[in-house]
């Protein structure tokens, strides 16, 4: 027998698959979904079960809504369970009890009320117990019924579910019908649609008709006004016409008589003509009060700007001014012709090279065409935008009778002009200034100890290795007079710093140790002082030592041109002991005496100028510069240009670290507020305002950059081979960080002077301040190591250096840096080796072994033959082969060497053509120290 699926049965019956599946389950069939298949007999049984259930569909008639929902429920549920009836019973006694509670007695008896409430609650509990008992009994009965007739209970539930679905479908159908009826009513009541195209066409036709009507009316009005005006002119008598002509002639004569005085404006004659009416259908603009005349019809009525432009254009004005249209201008007075003003020529003309003709014309108040004409007569072809040289401008001014002077342009960025200009200082304001004294001498001759004694402090004990690392500027008072001291380093690396100190000083104190005598840096200090034309006071120090010999020192100095006044020279000699404060007062008196002879003067009223003694980069303050004021007075908040930098003086401290607001001539101060750290030895100057200072500083920085670029060497035929050779050199990349700018300069110069053949030093970067992360990053990128002089790396930089394997060398003594750098440079050189013969042997017998090679039996005749040595095979005085030993044996034992007079066997690596009487020469390569 064939089978059918449930969805096929549903399709035949016109039912949903869900209903068919539910009916099959009601009939007790084991089906799961609409895809389940059943026998044809079962399918016929399912189809037959739907035939009596077709009656509920009739309820969708119009009479159905009249039946109430309660009756429908009664019909659809013919047999309600007994539990429902018993549930309705407890509701009957509730109503009378609520009525009793609602009626309140006049005097409340709370006790009676509590008793009544207690009785009510007891009755409710009894009723609930009875109901619960009945429900349990009914539930037990239902369970028994379910056990006895499970199929019947299942069919009742399915019937109820089916009835609910039928009711739901009827409600949905009813709502759909009502919705359709409402839509039909709305469609019947809606107004007819408007035909917008027809409406727009009708409106446009009405507008065109109205416009045509108004245009005709305006044209008729214009014609009527024109005819009325013509008739009025005809009516005038000839006498009136002659009177008007006479008035016009008088007015013309008055206008010609007036040349400089402008005539008063007369009111124009009243126009008796009928005024033209404006268009009634167009609003007039507020700013346009002219009247419209007759116009042709325009297609584009909405373009009001087009009409306005036509009315205000030159074309309309020209049209009005044509012949025959001048009737309106008859009574208007002509404007007087203004004469051109005459400008007198200047007596002097200050010019610069490259001025154009237009600029000259503007300055002398003449037309450029006039000047071009004069130049043409002089034989110079020029236009108004062409530049002229100074000679042509002078010839042109001679032609005009003007005295020409060339303008001298002042370079605002030139600071050095303040030091050489004669008119910068006021001779009447000059006052005596303190002397600037520089202490010079060789290393460890006692310069800083002397200065320490003068200042009563212990600066010298803090100096590393007994070397002063940078210039210090201090000021002391002796007998009520100030003396400024500059301390210079004595090491050879600080030559530039000593030269800088000599350039700003007035007196040089040359410190020479009585036990050491004249040293190389002593001679250098003498040369610097002589070059600067500075008087020298010789302080022979350490006279307290047993080996002191001042006379020898005086003789050695005389050999170098420093003669004592006792010997007929001009240098003062003072024997002192800086350590024990011996003869210090005599030295200071000598300084004041020499300063008095020099008559040192300064003008404190001008803007301050001076020199940078030292500069550094402070972590908290930024750029800090030590300045020596040479002329003028430096104040806080002064705009200043220092070298190639600029700024404003924010704070100023003296040599004791105290803040000051004013610094006079010969006063050393430290300032902050610069945008960068300047170079030591740069000049500084105070400007009028910050704007000019900024412009000068930026211009100086720009010039310095251009100069640096121009100084870059270019490859030429002369240095081409040197450049190629330099490419073969090895370089040591170094980053230098120091505490002050002078130390940076000294280190850079010293490292670049180190002469190691084949290796050169490359300064990748040098700056003032602590070693930071950017320095470590640069060192890693350029394969360099960092040299820190009197500075320390930050914690972050130290961690980064350890992570990136960057070497940081910290030093406080400059000659140790130089020695360490020399060793590093020598270590970078390729090792050089020299050949050394260690022994000779003669082959006495040869043995050929298969799969091994030729073994040579030998005897050492000189020196020794080592296993790790190289050998040469010499036959008849000619080297046949040069190689290494493969094995070396003494009898059957492997040995490291065979000494003189002994026998052994050897095999040469890669060579088997050994013959008797061959000489084996053993040698090694030894490294040569450089």
Swiss-Prot record:
<feature type="region of interest" description="G4">
    <location>
        <begin position="541"/>
        <end position="544"/>
    </location>
</feature>
<dbReference type="InterPro" id="IPR006847">
    <property type="entry name" value="IF2_N"/>
</dbReference>
<dbReference type="Pfam" id="PF11987">
    <property type="entry name" value="IF-2"/>
</dbReference>
<comment type="similarity">
    <text>Belongs to the TRAFAC class translation factor GTPase superfamily. Classic translation factor GTPase family. IF-2 subfamily.</text>
</comment>
<keyword id="KW-0547">Nucleotide-binding</keyword>
<dbReference type="GO" id="GO:0003924">
    <property type="term" value="F:GTPase activity"/>
</dbReference>
<feature type="compositionally biased region" description="Basic and acidic residues">
    <location>
        <begin position="157"/>
        <end position="167"/>
    </location>
</feature>
<dbReference type="InterPro" id="IPR015760">
    <property type="entry name" value="TIF_IF2"/>
</dbReference>
<keyword id="KW-0396">Initiation factor</keyword>
<feature type="domain" description="tr-type G">
    <location>
        <begin position="432"/>
        <end position="599"/>
    </location>
</feature>
<dbReference type="GO" id="GO:0005829">
    <property type="term" value="C:cytosol"/>
</dbReference>
<dbReference type="GO" id="GO:0005525">
    <property type="term" value="F:GTP binding"/>
</dbReference>
<comment type="function">
    <text>One of the essential components for the initiation of protein synthesis. Protects formylmethionyl-tRNA from spontaneous hydrolysis and promotes its binding to the 30S ribosomal subunits. Also involved in the hydrolysis of GTP during the formation of the 70S ribosomal complex.</text>
</comment>
<feature type="compositionally biased region" description="Basic and acidic residues">
    <location>
        <begin position="337"/>
        <end position="346"/>
    </location>
</feature>
<dbReference type="InterPro" id="IPR000178">
    <property type="entry name" value="TF_IF2_bacterial-like"/>
</dbReference>
<dbReference type="InterPro" id="IPR005225">
    <property type="entry name" value="Small_GTP-bd"/>
</dbReference>
<feature type="binding site">
    <location>
        <begin position="441"/>
        <end position="448"/>
    </location>
    <ligand>
        <name>GTP</name>
    </ligand>
</feature>
<feature type="binding site">
    <location>
        <begin position="487"/>
        <end position="491"/>
    </location>
    <ligand>
        <name>GTP</name>
    </ligand>
</feature>
<dbReference type="InterPro" id="IPR053905">
    <property type="entry name" value="EF-G-like_DII"/>
</dbReference>
<dbReference type="InterPro" id="IPR036925">
    <property type="entry name" value="TIF_IF2_dom3_sf"/>
</dbReference>
<dbReference type="InterPro" id="IPR009000">
    <property type="entry name" value="Transl_B-barrel_sf"/>
</dbReference>
<feature type="compositionally biased region" description="Low complexity">
    <location>
        <begin position="309"/>
        <end position="318"/>
    </location>
</feature>
<dbReference type="Pfam" id="PF04760">
    <property type="entry name" value="IF2_N"/>
</dbReference>
<keyword id="KW-0963">Cytoplasm</keyword>
<keyword id="KW-0342">GTP-binding</keyword>
<feature type="binding site">
    <location>
        <begin position="541"/>
        <end position="544"/>
    </location>
    <ligand>
        <name>GTP</name>
    </ligand>
</feature>
<feature type="region of interest" description="Disordered">
    <location>
        <begin position="50"/>
        <end position="217"/>
    </location>
</feature>
<feature type="compositionally biased region" description="Basic and acidic residues">
    <location>
        <begin position="262"/>
        <end position="295"/>
    </location>
</feature>
<feature type="compositionally biased region" description="Basic and acidic residues">
    <location>
        <begin position="68"/>
        <end position="90"/>
    </location>
</feature>
<dbReference type="InterPro" id="IPR023115">
    <property type="entry name" value="TIF_IF2_dom3"/>
</dbReference>
<keyword id="KW-0648">Protein biosynthesis</keyword>
<feature type="region of interest" description="G3">
    <location>
        <begin position="487"/>
        <end position="490"/>
    </location>
</feature>
<feature type="region of interest" description="G2">
    <location>
        <begin position="466"/>
        <end position="470"/>
    </location>
</feature>
<feature type="region of interest" description="Disordered">
    <location>
        <begin position="260"/>
        <end position="346"/>
    </location>
</feature>
<feature type="region of interest" description="G5">
    <location>
        <begin position="577"/>
        <end position="579"/>
    </location>
</feature>
<protein>
    <recommendedName>
        <fullName>Translation initiation factor IF-2</fullName>
    </recommendedName>
</protein>
<feature type="compositionally biased region" description="Basic and acidic residues">
    <location>
        <begin position="110"/>
        <end position="125"/>
    </location>
</feature>
<dbReference type="InterPro" id="IPR044145">
    <property type="entry name" value="IF2_II"/>
</dbReference>
<dbReference type="InterPro" id="IPR027417">
    <property type="entry name" value="P-loop_NTPase"/>
</dbReference>
<feature type="compositionally biased region" description="Low complexity">
    <location>
        <begin position="50"/>
        <end position="67"/>
    </location>
</feature>
<dbReference type="Pfam" id="PF22042">
    <property type="entry name" value="EF-G_D2"/>
</dbReference>
<dbReference type="GO" id="GO:0003743">
    <property type="term" value="F:translation initiation factor activity"/>
</dbReference>
């Amino acid at each position: 027998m064939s089978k059918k699926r449930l969805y096929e049965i549903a399709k035949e019956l016109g039912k949903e698959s869900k209903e068919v599946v539910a009916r099959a389950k009601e009939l007790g069939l084991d089906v799961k979904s609409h895809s389940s298949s059943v026998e044809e007999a079962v399918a016929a049984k399912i189809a037959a079960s739907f035939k009596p259930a077709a009656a509920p569909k009739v309820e969708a008639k119009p009479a159905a809504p009249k039946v109430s929902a309660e009756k429908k429920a009664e019909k659809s549920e013919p047999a309600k369970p007994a539990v429902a009836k018993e549930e309705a019973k407890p509701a009957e006694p509730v109503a009378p009890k609520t009525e009793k509670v609602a009626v309140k007695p006049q005097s409340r008896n709370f006790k009676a009320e509590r008793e009544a409430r207690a009785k009510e609650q007891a009755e409710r509990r009894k009723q609930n117990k009875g109901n619960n008992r009945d429900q349990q009994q009914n539930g037990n009965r239902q369970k028994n019924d379910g056990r006895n007739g499970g199929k019947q209970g299942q069919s009742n539930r399915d019937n109820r579910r089916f009835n609910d679905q039928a009711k739901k479908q009827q409600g949905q159908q009813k709502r759909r019908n009502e919705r359709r009826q409402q839509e039909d009513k709305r469609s019947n009541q809606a107004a007819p649609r408007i035909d917008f195209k027809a409406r727009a066409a009708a409106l446009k036709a009405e507008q065109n008709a109205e416009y045509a009507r108004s245009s005709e009316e305006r044209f008729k009005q214009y014609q009527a006004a024109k005819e009325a005006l013509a008739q009025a002119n005809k009516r005038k008598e000839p006498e009136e016409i002659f009177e008007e002509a006479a008035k016009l002639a008088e007015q013309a004569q008055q206008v010609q008589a007036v040349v400089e005085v402008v005539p008063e404006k007369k009111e124009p004659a009243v126009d008796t003509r009928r005024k033209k009416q404006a268009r009634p259908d167009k609003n007039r603009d507020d700013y346009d009060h002219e009247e419209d005349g007759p116009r042709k019809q325009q297609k584009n009525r909405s373009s009001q700007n087009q009409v306005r432009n036509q009315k205000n254009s030159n074309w309309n004005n020209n049209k009005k001014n044509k012949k025959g249209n001048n009737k309106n201008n008859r009574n208007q007075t002509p404007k007087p012709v203004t004469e051109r003003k005459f400008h007198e020529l200047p007596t002097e003309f200050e010019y610069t090279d490259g001025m154009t003709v237009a600029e000259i014309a503007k300055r002398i108040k003449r037309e450029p065409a006039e000047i071009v004409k004069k130049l043409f007569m002089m034989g110079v072809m020029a236009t108004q935008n062409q530049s002229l040289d100074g000679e042509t401008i002078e010839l042109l001014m001679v032609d005009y009778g003007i005295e020409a002077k060339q303008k001298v342009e002042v370079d605002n960025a030139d600071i050095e002009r303040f030091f050489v200009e004669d008119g910068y200082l006021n001779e009447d304001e000059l006052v005596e200034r303190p002397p600037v004294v520089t202490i010079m001498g060789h290393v460890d001759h006692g310069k800083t100890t002397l200065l320490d004694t003068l200042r009563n402090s212990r600066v010298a004990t803090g100096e590393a290795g007994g070397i002063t690392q940078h210039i210090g500027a201090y000021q002391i008072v002796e007998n009520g007079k100030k003396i400024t001291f500059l301390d210079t380093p004595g090491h050879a690396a600080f030559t530039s710093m000593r030269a800088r100190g000599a350039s700003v000083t007035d007196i040089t104190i040359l410190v020479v140790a009585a036990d050491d005598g004249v040293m190389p840096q002593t001679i250098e200090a003498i040369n610097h002082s002589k070059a600067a034309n500075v008087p020298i006071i010789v302080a022979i120090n350490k006279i307290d030592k047993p080996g002191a010999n001042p006379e020898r020192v005086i003789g050695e100095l005389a050999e170098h041109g420093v003669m004592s006044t006792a010997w007929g020279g001009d240098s003062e000699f003072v024997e002192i002991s800086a350590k024990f404060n011996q003869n210090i007062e005599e030295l200071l008196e000598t300084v004041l005496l020499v300063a008095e002879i020099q008559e040192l003067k300064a003008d404190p009223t001008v803007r301050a100028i001076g020199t940078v003694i030292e500069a550094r980069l402070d972590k908290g303050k930024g750029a800090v510069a030590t300045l020596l004021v040479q002329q003028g007075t430096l104040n806080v908040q002064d705009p200043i240009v220092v070298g190639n930098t600029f700024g404003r003086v924010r704070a100023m401290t003296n040599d004791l670290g105290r803040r000051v607001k004013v610094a006079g001539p010969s006063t050393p101060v430290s300032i902050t507020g610069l945008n960068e750290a300047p170079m030591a030895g740069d000049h500084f100057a105070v400007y009028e305002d910050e704007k000019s200072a900024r412009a000068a500083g930026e211009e100086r920085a720009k010039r310095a950059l251009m100069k640096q670029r121009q100084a870059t060497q270019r490859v030429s035929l002369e240095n081409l081979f040197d450049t190629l050779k330099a490419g073969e050199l090895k370089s040591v990349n170094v980053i230098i960080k120091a505490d002050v700018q002078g130390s940076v300069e000294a280190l850079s110069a010293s490292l670049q002077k180190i002469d190691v053949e084949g290796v050169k030093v490359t300064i990748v970067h040098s700056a003032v301040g602590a070693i930071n992360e950017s320095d470590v990053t640069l060192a890693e990128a350029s394969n360099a190591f960092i040299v820190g002089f009197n500075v320390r790396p930050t914690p972050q930089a130290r961690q980064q250096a350890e992570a990136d394997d960057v070497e940081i060398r910290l030093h406080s003594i400059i000659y140790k840096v130089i020695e360490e750098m020399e060793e590093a440079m020598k270590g970078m050189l390729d090792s050089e080796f020299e050949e050394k013969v260690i022994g000779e042997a003669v082959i006495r017998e040869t043995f050929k072994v298969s799969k091994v090679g030729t073994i040579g039996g030998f005897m050492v005749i000189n020196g020794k033959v080592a296993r790790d040595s190289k050998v040469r095979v010499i036959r008849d005085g000619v080297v046949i082969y040069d190689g290494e030993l493969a094995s070396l044996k003494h009898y059957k034992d492997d040995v490291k060497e065979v000494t003189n007079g002994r026998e052994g066997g050897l095999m040469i690596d890669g060579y088997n053509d050994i013959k008797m009487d061959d000489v084996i020469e053993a040698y090694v390569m030894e490294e040569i120290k450089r």
